[in-house]
Design a protein with these regions (language model features):
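C-terminal catalytic "cap/lid" subdomain
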Residues: 1-213
Length: 213
């Protein structure tokens, strides 16, 4: 990737998001403990003696909109078709998954039609078979599909809370590279898109070039 650079500082929350989104830098638990007890961390290189990136509660770089781009290729999208468009349907679905400790990430619900709707969600590829089996064995959901050719690309940065247009630039980068977005999830400091797995590396480079060049 072109024009990468080291961050001087990053917040605990930003580092936690990046770690959970596939950035292989720090273990989630280590950052959670550091945040809990407000202990600063420094990410160093074993090959280079220069100062590293400090992970702390508040940084001096809050004006920097985006702190990182991450990808996760361990993603499956499961879609349940033609479920009743009525109260309690989502509880029945995700209650079954929770009983099997299946971690659900992004959820997308279609607009209801003729009393029916479709619900899609993402989970790890390793949990996809279990999720399919649980849903079908319940006898309530038989029309279930699974797409195991997906990836998630995300941008993280606390600066997004006070600046508009970041999502637009991310989507523009993907559009310019003919990358289709299947699902979108946002929070105060994160935007994630589900795309085709074969496009993951290209997407990360395109987003980085759009937001950091």
């Amino acid at each position: 990737m072109r024009n990468t650079r080291k961050l001087e500082e990053i917040t605990f929350d930003e580092m936690l998001e990046l770690a959970s989104l596939g950035a292989q830098v720090l273990n989630n638990r280590s950052v959670e403990l550091a945040k809990k007890y407000n202990v600063e961390l420094e990410v160093l290189s074993s090959l280079n003696p220069i100062p590293g990136t400090v992970v702390k509660e508040v940084t001096k770089m809050e004006g920097m909109l985006i702190k990182g781009v991450a990808k996760d290729t361990d993603v499956a999208v499961i879609t349940i078709l033609n479920v009743p468009d009525e109260p309690g349907t989502s509880f029945k679905i995700f209650g079954l998954l929770a009983q099997k400790n299946i971690n659900v990430d992004i959820i997308l619900q279609s607009t209801g039609r003729d009393g029916k709707k479709d619900i899609s969600f993402t989970c790890s590829e390793g949990e996809a078979d279990t999720a399919l089996r649980v849903l079908k064995d319940s006898g309530k959901f038989q029309d279930v599909t699974c797409d195991e050719t997906c990836a998630k690309v995300s941008i993280v940065g606390a600066g997004m809370q006070s600046h508009s247009g970041v999502a637009s630039k991310m989507f523009e980068a993907l559009s310019n590279n003919n990358i289709n977005i299947k699902m979108i999830s946002t929070s105060e400091i994160k935007i994630s898109c589900i795309i085709d797995r074969n496009d993951a590396d290209k997407a990360v480079s395109a987003i980085h070039d759009m937001l950091f060049d």
